[in-house]
Amino acid sequence: MSNPDAVSIDSVIQAMYESISGGAGEPRQWERDRALHHPKALLVPARQASGGPGAGVFDFDGFVASRAPYLDANDFYEIEIGRREFRFGAIAHVLSFYEARSTPEGGLLRRGVNSIQLMHDGERWWILSTVWDNEREGLSLPDLTPSN
């Protein structure tokens, strides 16, 4: 195992959030993030940039090209606030609830859900796809109280 970020689902999710978070003008950890994603991984916002419905489907390079200008110019910290995880054999599906903030502790920008599909190849975990959507009028995060 050469990538400590890929040893567990927890380490993958933590590294994913850490890699895109930072202050305006701070370089993001794109290569760290790339190393979490399978070479054929897809990243899919469930809403268009205009806010309307419809998926934009990106490979990793397309995702970086679409997000880097905003992240380079803005303080942006994405923090996991809850999770639902389902595993079967070498596959896992994680619903990761997040807050995006302008500072690590404040300045709430938005909240949403990342639907992350992962696979263990016998040596490490890979992100195969991530689809996400944000809260908006008429759509709120579900209750995050842990279920028994």
Predicted feature locations:
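A short, polar/proline- and glycine-enriched secondary-structure boundary/capping micro-motif
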Residues: 54-57, 105-108, 136-144
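Hydrophobic pocket/interface hotspot
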Residues: 16, 33, 41, 94, ...
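Surface-exposed, charged secondary-structure patches
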Residues: 42-43, 47-105
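Short beta-strand edge/turn micro-motifs at domain boundaries
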Residues: 111-139
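Short beta-strand segments enriched in hydrophobic/aromatic residues
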Residues: 20, 37, 98-100, 131-133
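Short, surface-exposed coil-to-beta transition loops
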Residues: 78-81, 109-115
